[in-house]
Amino acid sequence: LGKDVLDLNEVTVTVSSDELGERTLFDKVTWSIGPGDRIGLIGVNGAGKTTLLNLFDGSRKPDSGRVKHGKTLRLAHLRQEVDDLDSAMTVLESVNDVKARTKLATGRDASATDLLEGFGFTGQKLVTRIGDLSGGEQRRLQLLRLLMDEPNVLLLDEPTNDLDIDTLRLLEDYLDSWPGTLIVVSHDRWFLERVCDVVWALMGDGTVAFLPGGISQYLEHRRNRKPSPSKSSRVGSTSQVAEPKMGAAELRQARSRNHLSW
């Protein structure tokens, strides 16, 4: 990656719905993301976290302003849905369809079968149709297909959804040594604090704010119901902070984790 990875320049996005009417998700937001940045994204319900990831990958265009990609960017986006998988394919066919061999973050060359085994797909599972896999297994396969493509920027939208305890540990360990740029949306506090270096919040008023105090600052902001984060492009007040869903609470308990409803 060069010095320029992802840049938002005066980006504005407005959405409308019958329930909430017209709302501005982003109001002239300017933000630069560099090589090796590891960012956790949190925010109020409906603030636009998924929309922001879609702006980054180009599937959503801003109403005004510009989203710029670095010249050497290879971006992969893990969405909350698993409908990008072909249910008629077998597990091995699905991975080979991306690439037969790949290079790991450690520099070691690995085959599709090697990685599948590392992700818990062995024996009969290799020839199992995707449509016959559990939701957690499909999520695991979706992650593996992204990593096989050797991206240097990862966008992860609720990556811990449906993952079993072993896959959670494997994903955390992999991302710990992954050298690229990482942007994660998650309600799993442990996961964010393990794999991300900084936290940014979508405040629900069209602004994106850096939280130097991390998730603890967000929790304090939620308790006080008054603005406290540092300014990015523009930071205003917000009257209601999201109450995140628990998500995989049993798994957190199994690992003696501190999963908070923040």
Where are these regions (language model features)?
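ABC ATP-binding cassette signature C-motif
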Residues: 2-262
